[in-house]
Regions:
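A C-terminal cap/extension of S-adenosyl-L-methionine-dependent methyltransferases
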Residues: 14, 151, 196-276
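Conserved beta-strand signature within the Rossmann-like core of class I S-adenosyl-L-methionine
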Residues: 148-154
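Acceptor-substrate binding/catalytic loop of class I
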Residues: 161-180
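A short beta-strand submotif of the Rossmann-like class I SAM-dependent methyltransferase core
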Residues: 123-126
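Conserved N-terminal segment of class I S-adenosyl-L-methionine
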Residues: 2-110, 137, 251-252, 262-273
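Conserved S-adenosyl-L-methionine
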Residues: 186-197
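A short acidic, Gly/Pro-enriched loop at the edge of an enzyme's catalytic core
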Residues: 109-120
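A short glycine-rich, Lys/Arg-flanked "PGG" loop and its adjoining helix->strand segment in the class I
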Residues: 134-146
Length: 276
């Protein structure tokens, strides 16, 4: 039954591929999401806000900006930047008139800020889109103040059910990110989040279908397409809110892992990196 539903949904999409932009792969307000997806969104900013008390904060690749307001509760100033015009317009419209929040169109490879401008930089689910991540790390180091912090998270490519995002260039493991960051003058701590739970029979079927879909490039390319697929297999979804809030999902804090450890049993990796 699940296989039939999946193929009936996906084959027409593959016959009618369209050009996509970053907005179409952004977890934007109003898109249906599972409880775990909402928890992941909430966890990102709940984790980051601990570093933001009284600080100047920059979120690079902020998408539609759902996290900016949450960070601004503690931060002195929050700047959100994204390369996608639609994302920037959405965030600007929502935060219009909000004190302490600024939204800019920026390129992560060439950040338009003076040296030593920020205490905290956040980069969530975006490093794998960058053509030259080393340029971003160089720029991040340049604009961070002494003892500044870079907080990152990424889908875990070592998880067996990992599915690469459209437009992605290169995914990095936790170990690879730590090694890369340390080449650019950071001291990095790897963490992992969302351990894989024991699978039910239904979960096993969905997992098999997902792996087949990934192998043959049949996974929908847009967030809206993925939303429809989730409805088929998972039923009712909840809408992603325009601003992160404490009631939207469970907080599952990332856990420290040993350096050099391969991470097969978690869906998400985090890195907390500090300027040497």
């Amino acid at each position: 039954m699940y296989v039939d539903k999946f193929m009936n949904f996906i084959l027409p999409m593959e016959k009618n591929k369209i050009n996509i932009n970053y907005n179409t792969v952004t977890e934007a307000p109003g898109i249906g999401a599972t409880a775990q997806q909402l928890s992941m969104l909430y966890t990102r900013y709940r984790y980051a806000v601990q570093f933001c008390e009284g600080k100047d904060v920059l979120e690079v690749a902020c998408g539609s900006g759902q996290g900016l307001g949450y960070l601004a509760r503690k931060a002195r100033k929050v700047v959100g930047g994204d390369i996608d015009t639609t994302n920037v317009a959405t965030a600007r419209d929502y935060y219009k008139g909000r004190t302490g929040i600024e939204v800019l169109k920026i390129d992560a490879h060439q950040l338009p800020f003076e040296n030593n401008s920020f205490d905290v930089i956040i980069l969530y689910e975006a490093i794998y889109y960058f053509e030259m991540p080393e340029k971003f790390f160089t720029e991040a180091k340049r604009i961070l103040r002494d003892e500044g912090v870079l907080v990152m998270c990424s889908a875990n490519k070592e998880w067996p059910d990992f599915n690469p995002s459209p437009f992605s260039k290169t995914y990095y493991s936790a170990t690879e990110l730590v090694e890369l960051l340390e080449k650019f003058g950071f001291v990095a701590e790897p963490l992992a989040a969302y351990p894989v739970e024991k699978l039910t029979t239904r979960d096993c079927v969905v997992s098999i279908i997902k792996r087949i879909a990934v192998q043959f490039h049949l996974v929908p390319k847009t967030m809206r397409g993925k939303e429809l697929l989730k409805k088929i297999f998972l039923g009712k979804l909840s809408s992603i809110p325009p601003e992160i809030n404490d009631e939207m999902g469970l907080y599952l804090p990332p856990q420290s892992i040993s350096r050099g450890t391969r991470v097969f049993g978690h869906k998400v990796i985090y890195i907390t990196a500090r300027v040497k």
